[in-house]
Regions:
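Low-complexity, intrinsically disordered or signal/transmembrane-proximal segments
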Residues: 3-5, 17
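Short terminal hydrophobic/aromatic SLiMs and anchors at protein ends
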Residues: 7-12
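Residues lining hydrophobic/aromatic ligand-binding pockets adjacent to catalytic sites
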Residues: 13-175
């Protein structure tokens, strides 16, 4: 299958992604966080659950627009929701916080995620802060973890949400 159909961008080696994650979290504190972000790549479902429960997460907010994993069916919406609920947490899917396929395709064509960030800030963050932040803060049990796929939060749209929430006075940490 041609790369454009898989909708992937060049990805850094896992070691570098983990280093970037440490840099991202450098000025943040897990103890002071009132929300979390998390990527599931490179984790077993057991590791995902252990990380969430160890940090007191009450609600996992899935911010993938299309919550299906072809490679890891246990992380598709129905299976993941069941797993999360079996461990006493709440699963919530917020597809409006995801990135549409056509925007990801444009990023691939350009070879940079900047296309995603620009689109996301304009079409998701601005309305989210303007209309949906109150709903988001009051419709789920806290603390929440915003979940997507990537290890490095800076390679994922969840970092844009994190920056927006931090701009509003909240404190985040990537698990």
């Amino acid at each position: 299958m041609p790369q454009a159909h898989r909708l992937t961008l060049p990805t850094l080696p896992v070691k570098r992604q983990l280093e970037n994650k440490l840099i991202w979290n450098g000025a943040r504190s897990v103890e002071k966080a009132n929300f979390f972000t998390i990527g599931y790549t490179g984790r077993t479902t057991k590791e995902l659950i252990t990380t969430l429960t160890a940090n007191g997460v009450r609600t996992l907010v899935d911010i993938r627009q299309n919550p299906i994993s072809m490679y890891r069916p246990e992380l598709s919406k129905t299976n993941l929701a069941r797993l999360i609920e079996e461990h006493g947490m709440i699963y919530a899917h917020f597809p409006q916080l995801g990135v549409p396929r056509d925007i990801r395709a444009k990023a691939i064509e350009s070879g940079t995620r900047d296309v995603i960030w620009e689109w996301y800030d304009q079409h998701v963050i601005a309305p989210f802060l303007g209309r949906n932040l109150h709903y988001f803060l009051n419709c789920v049990e806290h603390p929440v973890a915003l979940m997507c796929t990537e290890i490095d939060p800076q390679e994922c749209h969840r970092h844009r949400l994190s920056l927006a929430l931090e701009h509003m006075g909240m404190t985040g940490f990537d698990l």
